């Protein structure tokens, strides 16, 4: 015990030294570009040696969605993810999944076997590991490595449906829930027709996928074992896919359900057969509650954070139209408190399904990322696109398991990630430049982010709270000056400046 205490004390002292040194460096007027600073593996391990503290702060930091990356690929790239300033990763679903034709690994293609990315969204048993991402042992090893870097692991789970081909569901799943007759809601094979009808929306078949009876106590017991095993392996949170299709306690009940108690149980407020969700108070939990008719998005925040899907759509349009009007940018377009929102400029659904974001360029995505990450509230989620040509849906370079493209390491992405860390607790203020094509985001009196969508250079002359002096922006090395409270400088076309 004495050795453990001494080791822990030394770790705390090292972290304190690192943090104090970083603060002293940041307070100086440096002429170097911080985003290009080389950080050793040893420094990263010391700086992030308290993952419990890190998990509590996921809500205020940034998440990287490592979409379709295998566990081993994630593990190999954790040093780069940490250097890029991400404090959490979100994996694709890690459960046993549909295998289909020849266990294909194509993300999407027109070949005979077609695309398979959506197969891990069709669970056939609630146990860790699938042919696409890796084994339970590999998942556990990845989580252990992530903990060394202070990176939280969030796992995507999809409880309310199963394979579109029911014979794929493994016998252990069927037996655990009490047989085939108890697997689905009474309404579970009927397609949703009226999306504003909460009974249909929370019990009906969606997208060809039968609706699992998530209120069946036997299912809940079985699924709790999976959740707690995932936590035991090192998961620090969960994203609940299609969360708005799982009923809230006061929603209409299915004929096969006694209570709509899924959310109280799987957020740690209620036990199932004596089993509680492990470490519930430490987990970051959020639900995919896409906004629409009678989505009840605010009501879900009693249990989990929720997605700000309308804001993401509005922001994409604003960037594509080069109109960063303050009314568009400031309005979350959501009834919930903004500290309960998960934000994105692109998600795997907006990229991979109808492709409404797939034609956006790398810079357009970085501009959107800069805006949501520079803001005071919301938890920004960065979608890692597959490798290949930009502004292209499924370029055909990557397959399932591969690393995505390198945009997560772009200096503009890294700079705003670190800006967010430095600005926790500071208020936000928005202004436009000479036109609505330029946006200036101020965080208290500590920092400024400028996004320039113009085809030409923008001359900045703006009153700020920053101390007088010369500043080098952390993204592109642009020189700025503050004199008598006026920030001046020039930002070239299609650039982002991060100043603090």
Question: Model regions: which residues?
Answer:
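An active-site-proximal structural segment forming one wall of the substrate-binding cleft
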Residues: 71-74, 80-84, 88-89, 138-151, ...
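C-terminal motif of bacterial Sec signal peptides marking the signal peptidase cleavage site
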Residues: 24-27
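Bacterial signal peptide processing site
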Residues: 29-31
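Bacterial N-terminal signal peptides that target proteins for export
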Residues: 2-14
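Soluble non-cytosolic domains of exported or imported proteins
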Residues: 68-75, 133, 137, 213-217, ...
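N-terminal carbohydrate-binding accessory modules
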Residues: 34-67, 73-83, 175-194
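Aromatic- and acidic-residue-enriched carbohydrate-binding clefts of CAZyme catalytic domains
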Residues: 57-61, 97-144, 176-213
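Active-site-proximal helices and loops of the catalytic beta/alpha 8
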Residues: 38-60, 76-82, 93, 98-121, ...
């Amino acid at each position: 015990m004495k050795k453990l205490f001494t080791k822990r004390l030394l770790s705390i002292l090292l972290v304190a030294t690192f943090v104090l040194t970083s603060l002293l460096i940041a307070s100086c007027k440096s002429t170097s570009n911080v985003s290009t600073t080389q950080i050793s593996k040893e420094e990263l391990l010391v700086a992030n040696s308290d993952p419990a503290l890190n998990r509590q702060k996921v809500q205020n930091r940034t998440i990287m969605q490592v979409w379709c990356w295998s566990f081993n690929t994630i593990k190999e790239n954790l040093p780069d993810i940490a250097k890029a300033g991400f404090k959490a990763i979100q994996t694709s679903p890690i459960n046993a999944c549909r295998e289909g034709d020849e266990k294909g690994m194509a993300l999407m293609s027109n070949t005979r076997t077609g695309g398979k990315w959506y197969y891990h969204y069709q669970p056939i048993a609630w146990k860790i590991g699938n042919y696409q991402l890796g084994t339970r042992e590999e998942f556990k090893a990845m989580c252990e490595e992530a903990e060394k870097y202070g990176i939280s692991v969030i796992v995507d789970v999809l409880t309310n449906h199963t394979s579109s081909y029911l014979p794929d569901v493994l016998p252990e799943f069927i037996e655990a829930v009490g047989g085939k007759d108890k697997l689905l809601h009474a309404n579970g094979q009927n397609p949703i027709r009226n999306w504003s009808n909460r009974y249909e929306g929370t019990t009906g078949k969606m997208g060809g996928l039968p609706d699992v009876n998530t209120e069946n106590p036997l299912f809940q017991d079985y699924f709790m074992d999976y959740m707690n095993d995932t936590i035991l392996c090192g998961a620090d949170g969960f994203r609940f896919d299609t969360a708005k299709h799982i009923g809230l306690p006061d929603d209409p009940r299915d004929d096969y359900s006694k209570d709509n108690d899924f959310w109280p149980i799987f957020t740690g407020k209620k036990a199932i057969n004596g089993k509680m969700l492990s470490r519930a108070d430490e987990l970051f939990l959020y639900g995919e509650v896409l906004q629409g008719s009678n989505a009840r998005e605010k009501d879900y925040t009693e249990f989990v954070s929720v997605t700000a899907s309308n804001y993401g759509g509005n922001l994409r349009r604003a960037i594509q139209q080069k109109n960063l009007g303050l009314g568009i940018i400031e309005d979350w377009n959501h009834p919930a408190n903004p500290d309960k929102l998960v934000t994105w400029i692109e998600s795997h659904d907006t990229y991979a399904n109808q492709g409404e974001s797939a034609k956006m360029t790398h810079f357009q995505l970085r501009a959107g990322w800069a805006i949501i990450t520079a803001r005071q509230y919301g938890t920004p989620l960065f979608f890692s696109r597959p490798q290949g040509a930009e502004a292209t849906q499924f370029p055909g370079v990557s397959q399932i398991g591969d690393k995505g493209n390198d945009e997560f390491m772009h200096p503009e992405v890294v700079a705003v990630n670190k800006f967010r860390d430095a600005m926790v607790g500071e208020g936000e203020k928005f202004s436009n430049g000479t036109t609505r094509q330029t946006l200036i985001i101020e965080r208290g009196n500590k920092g400024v982010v400028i996004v320039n969508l113009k085809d030409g250079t923008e001359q900045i002359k703006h009153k700020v709270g920053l101390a007088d002096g010369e500043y080098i922006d952390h993204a592109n090395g642009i020189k700025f000056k503050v004199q008598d409270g006026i920030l001046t400088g020039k930002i070239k076309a299609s650039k982002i400046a991060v100043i603090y």
